[in-house]
Amino acid sequence: MSRIDANKLGELEERVVTINRVAKVVKGGRRFRFTALVVVGDRNGHVGFGTGKAQEVPDAIRKAVEDAKKNLVEVPRVGGTTPHLVLGRFGAGEILIKPAAPGTGVIAGGPVRAVLELAGITDILSKSLGSNTPINMVRATVQGLTELKRVEDVAKLRGKSVEEILG
């Protein structure tokens, strides 16, 4: 899959999913740092996520945004939903993403909702299965979205026309 240049997409919207304080125990006590999980997207079929770690929260968020812009993926959409049902997996986290009729809205939990909304999906059903750790849910969602295929791609793979595929 080719890399998407964030500079060519224009304005990307950022959403902080989680901020976590982590500690390193040393001889003199605990050293605290912050990790941030951020999702970025243009609400037009491009979305990415990133993580950052720093001694201060704003620095962690800035690093996470930079990381997210390097990890953008393209999401195929049909109207405001996905072309077909997909199951995304990462670690113990699983997410079921199911197309929905117009007017349904985004039915998804916190981290998954952030990814789907910033990808530009307006009508979707989802169910998180397994682990509910935010980073695993985000990774599973993005992994599932990358598995989506357009009708044109499926037709080309099977050596058929789009009309034959659609029935």
Swiss-Prot record:
GO terms for molecular function: rRNA binding; structural constituent of ribosome. The keyword Ribonucleoprotein applies. Keywords: Ribonucleoprotein, Ribosomal protein, RNA-binding, rRNA-binding. InterPro entries: Ribosomal_Su5_D2-typ_SF (IPR020568), Ribosomal_uS5 (IPR000851), Ribosomal_uS5_bac-type (IPR005712), Ribosomal_uS5_C (IPR005324), Ribosomal_uS5_N (IPR013810), Ribosomal_uS5_N_CS (IPR018192), Ribsml_uS5_D2-typ_fold_subgr (IPR014721). Residues 12-75 form the S5 DRBM domain. GO terms for cellular component: small ribosomal subunit. NCBIfam families: rpsE_bact. Belongs to the universal ribosomal protein uS5 family. With S4 and S12 plays an important role in translational accuracy. Located at the back of the 30S subunit body where it stabilizes the conformation of the head with respect to the body. Part of the 30S ribosomal subunit. Contacts proteins S4 and S8. The N-terminal domain interacts with the head of the 30S subunit; the C-terminal domain interacts with the body and contacts protein S4. The interaction surface between S4 and S5 is involved in control of translational fidelity. This is Small ribosomal subunit protein uS5. It comes from Lysinibacillus sphaericus (strain C3-41).
